[in-house]
Amino acid sequence: MNKSTLTAALTLPALTVACAGVLGSPPARADTVAYLVNVTVRPGYNFANADDALSYGHTVCTDIGSGRSYDDVMGRIKSDFNNPDDYQASYLINQAVNELCPALIWQLRNSAANYRPPQS
């Protein structure tokens, strides 16, 4: 067996496995039920109903998708729910993006990367 045949014999299976992993990955899918359970069971948001909770979550997705800064989204949520707690706001953002618009996870991570909570 010559060198090029050996290289091809070793490279082809590795490329096949790598391509199968990339091409075979299922797309991220929204899970509205998980979102609703997580934000309606958790105290503090007090959505009037499931439609209001979903609408609010989709607004968060729109904000993140349009490039609104993490700081701005956090501030709006804190204001809307009259709650200064960073954890409460970030929980809602994470639930919305992870469950309703998972394709935006990368954008959320980039936006939140340099976020620093305000000093009390």
Name every feature range the model reports, one short phrase each.
Residues 39-45, 50-51:
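Extracytoplasmic/periplasm-facing segments of secreted or lipoprotein envelope proteins
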Residues 20-37:
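C-terminal region of N-terminal signal peptides and the immediate post-cleavage residues
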Residues 45-48, 64-65, 83-85:
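Short acidic, glycine/proline-enriched loop segments that cap or flank alpha-helices
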